[in-house]
């Protein structure tokens, strides 16, 4: 029966504690349930009832006296302040329940453990309430359980670690999680009798209690601390990525614009070429330019001013379509039977030429260049690439090339009818007819004009001579070896300093031979020498001639002037021709030759002017540029034809262009008085 009094004694303290605790209890629920205002009424029974139910079993005999003393005892009041300073009261409550009820209190500890997140969340709305209430709730637990003071030393051990992380670092995340604990806490006190109700809530609160523990608080410390950093790094990274992506897109756009412009420049649909009116000795229309383009099967035809259709070669056309561009040395050696003497076609300044037959049965001419060596391979390829793009009816087509250790070889189409030099000067050859000579002169002029004005880049031949004018079976001229002088010079410059002038004696222009100045006019001079060969039938340098007449140009200069003035060609024309020529065509050819071999390069005509002069013999085209052969003064207009006077008046601004003038000019024209007949091949 002595046990009965303690129970009533315990109940008064509990009531006293309840009476004394209401202020703290009202403050205590504020700490966990500050966010929801509805929780204060159910919360007061939250902490005392479980304490009353759990504490009686252990301290039934010993706790009554201390239980009555603690409520008024000031020591209890004094003890909380250190707890407030060191750690919040929840840790004290954490330590006391576990020993009291191992079975029923585990739900309560998570409930008591869960309030720490609300204080973590509560500091943001009411910061002062979180600091003041904890000392007041602390008296009630120690008053009810004096026996746990032995265990209280253990909480301070975790408490030093807990206060710093909980109050300082956890505020941001708990607000989202603190909503669930308050909602669960009021439900638990509302159902005090049934203990099973907190049990289903425990798993929900355990994940919440994990972040609030000492170790979990450290985890929380890392999470919030890292999340702002991640957000900051994320924003900076996003900005950097955006800048990089913008630069990439900008570079792609610039590259696209550049490629489109480059493609427009190299568009195979735009064809450029040399426009030539139909000639009396030209081949059928459209055959002036042959295009070998692997990209387009049939290049478009463009109509010239005279109404004739001409095919134009593209500047970026590659090698001959559907054919190889590179050959091995062994293959070319096999094709030419080991470069045997029986296959030797000739030998020139750049090397020997051998005849060969490819595996597909195509006949080719293999030129083995004297220039070689391992150096200069890049320059050789560059020049070969330029040459391979040149395709014209009057130019020999380059089929391919070979670069070996010490060898450089070029493969051309084989032209079966030998060279102009062979047909003009070889002993025992039949005399070339005048019509054949005119055809050869016109074709060679077209090919050289194409090199000078329509190739990109323009090509200066540097070694135009009769042995480089090849003839096919119909005696159409094809210019060979163009670009080789440039290749030789580039390759020589890589091995040693070369100052030698490319060319053949007797064909070289005087300014090029003396000073090395190179221009298109040097090729014009060489072509003039070829015209003199066609007219006279003599070699450029003939040692069998009397002293002083070895040079063809120097011997022909005075005769050219006399032939133009007197229209007498007997002393100048090839004796083997006799009178088998057309005077009008002979006059025009003599005039063109005299203009091409002038001493002054500036006074020489362009090859396009020579082409027009040879193609339009019935028209009055002035290619003399107002100069007599061998003179350096301007023609006197009173001594010239009416056409020249008309051009001078147009040039110097005369406005007298009446019909009478044209009538007089046509009636007194020196060209009209001359009996001209158009030659039809």
UniProtKB/Swiss-Prot annotation:
Glycan attachment residues as annotated in the record: 16, 220
Q: Spell out the Low complexity composition-biased ranges.
A: 177-191
The keyword Membrane is annotated on this UniProt entry: yes
Identify one Gene Ontology CC term for this UniProt entry. Answer: plasma membrane
Q: Which residues carry this modification: Phosphoserine?
A: 467, 498
- Which portions of the chain have biased composition (kind: Pro residues)? 1-11, 21-163, 192-201
Q: Which residues carry this modification: Phosphothreonine?
A: 499, 504
Name where it's found: Cell membrane
The stretches that face the Cytoplasmic side, renumbered to this chain, are 259-681
Which residue ranges does UniProt annotate as crossing the membrane? 238-258
Write the Enzyme Commission number(s) for this entry.
2.7.11.1
Ordered alphabetically, the record's keywords are: ATP-binding, Cell membrane, Glycoprotein, Kinase, Membrane, Nucleotide-binding, Phosphoprotein, Serine/threonine-protein kinase, Transferase, Transmembrane, Transmembrane helix
User: What one GO molecular function would you report for this record?
Assistant: protein serine kinase activity
Residues noted as binding ATP in the record, renumbered to the chain: 345-353, 367
The record ties this protein, via Pfam families, to: Pkinase
Tissue specificity comment = Mostly expressed in seedlings, roots, inflorescence bolts and flower buds.
Q: Which residues are in the Protein kinase domain?
A: 339-617
* Job description of the protein: Could be involved in the negative regulation of root growth.
**Subunit comment:** Interacts with KIPK1 and KIPK2 (via its cytosolic domain).
Q: What is the official name of this protein in its record?
A: Proline-rich receptor-like protein kinase PERK8
Gene source species: Arabidopsis thaliana
């Amino acid at each position: 029966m002595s046990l009965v009094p303690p129970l009533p004694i315990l109940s008064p303290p509990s009531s006293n504690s309840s009476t004394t605790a209401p202020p703290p209890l009202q403050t205590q629920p504020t700490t966990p349930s500050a966010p929801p205002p509805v929780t204060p009424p159910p919360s007061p029974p939250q902490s005392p009832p479980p304490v009353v139910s759990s504490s009686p079993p252990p301290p039934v005999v010993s706790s009554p006296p201390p239980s009555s003393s603690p409520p008024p005892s000031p020591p209890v009041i004094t003890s909380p302040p250190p707890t407030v300073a060191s750690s919040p009261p929840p840790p004290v409550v954490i330590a006391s329940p576990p020993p009291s009820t191992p079975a029923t209190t585990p739900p309560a500890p998570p409930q008591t453990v869960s309030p720490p997140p609300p204080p973590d969340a509560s500091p943001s709305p009411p910061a002062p309430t979180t600091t003041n209430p904890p000392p007041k709730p602390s008296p009630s637990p120690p008053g009810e359980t004096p026996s746990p003071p032995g265990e209280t030393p253990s909480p301070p051990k975790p408490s030093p670690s807990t206060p710093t992380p909980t109050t300082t670092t956890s505020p941001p995340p708990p607000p989202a999680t603190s909503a669930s604990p308050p909602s669960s806490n009021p439900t638990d006190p509302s159902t005090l009798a049934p203990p099973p109700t907190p049990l289903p809530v425990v798993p929900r609160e355990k994940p919440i209690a994990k972040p609030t523990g000492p170790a979990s608080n450290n985890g929380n410390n890392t999470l919030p601390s890292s999340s702002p950093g991640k957000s900051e790094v994320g924003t900076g990274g996003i900005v950097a990525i955006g800048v990089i992506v913008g630069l990439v897109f900008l570079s792609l756009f610039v590259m696209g614009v550049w490629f489109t412009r480059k493609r427009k420049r190299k568009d195979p649909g735009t064809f450029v070429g040399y426009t030539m009116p139909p000639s009396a000795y030209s081949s059928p229309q459209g055959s002036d330019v042959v295009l070998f383009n692997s990209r387009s099967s049939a290049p478009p035809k463009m109509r010239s001013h005279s109404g004739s259709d001409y095919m134009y070669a593209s500047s970026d056309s590659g090698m001959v379509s559907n054919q190889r561009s590179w050959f091995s040395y062994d293959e070319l050696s096999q094709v030419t039977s080991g470069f045997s003497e029986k296959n030797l076609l000739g030998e020139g300044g750049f090397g020997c030429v051998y005849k060969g037959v490819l595996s597909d049965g195509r006949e080719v001419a293999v030129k083995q260049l004297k220039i070689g060596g391992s150096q200069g391979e890049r320059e050789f390829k560059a020049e070969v690439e330029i040459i391979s793009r040149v395709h014209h009816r009057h130019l020999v087509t380059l089929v391919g090339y070979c670069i070996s250790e010490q060898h450089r070889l070029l493969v051309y189409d084989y032209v079966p009818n030998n060279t102009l030099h062979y047909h003009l000067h070889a002993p025992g050859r039949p005399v070339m007819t005048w019509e054949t000579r005119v055809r050869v002169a016109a074709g060679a002029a077209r090919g050289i004009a194409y090199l000078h004005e329509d190739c990109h880049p323009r090509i200066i031949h540097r070694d135009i001579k009769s042995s480089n004018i090849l003839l096919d079976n119909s005696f159409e001229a094809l210019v060979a070896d163009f670009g080789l002088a440039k290749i030789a010079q580039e390759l020589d410059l890589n091995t040693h300093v070369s100052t030698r002038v490319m060319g053949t004696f007797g064909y070289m222009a005087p300014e090029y031979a003396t000073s090395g100045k190179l221009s298109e006019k040097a090729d014009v001079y060489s072509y003039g020498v070829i015209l003199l060969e066609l007219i006279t039938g003599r070699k450029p340098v003939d040692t069998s001639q009397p002293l002083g007449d070895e040079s063809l140009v120097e011997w022909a200069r005075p005769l050219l002037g006399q032939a133009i003035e007197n229209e007498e060609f007997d002393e100048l024309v090839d004796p083997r021709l006799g009178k088998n020529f057309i005077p009008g065509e002979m006059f025009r050819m003599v005039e063109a030759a005299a203009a091409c071999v002038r001493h002054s390069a500036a006074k020489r005509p362009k090859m396009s002017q020579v082409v027009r002069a040879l193609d339009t013999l019935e028209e009055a085209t002035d290619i003399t540029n107002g100069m007599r052969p061998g003179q350096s003064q301007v023609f006197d207009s009173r001594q010239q034809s009416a056409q020249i006077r008309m051009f001078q008046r147009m040039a110097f601004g005369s406005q007298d262009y009446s019909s009478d003038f044209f009538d007089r000019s046509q009636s007194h024209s020196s060209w009209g008085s001359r009996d001209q007949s158009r030659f039809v091949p």
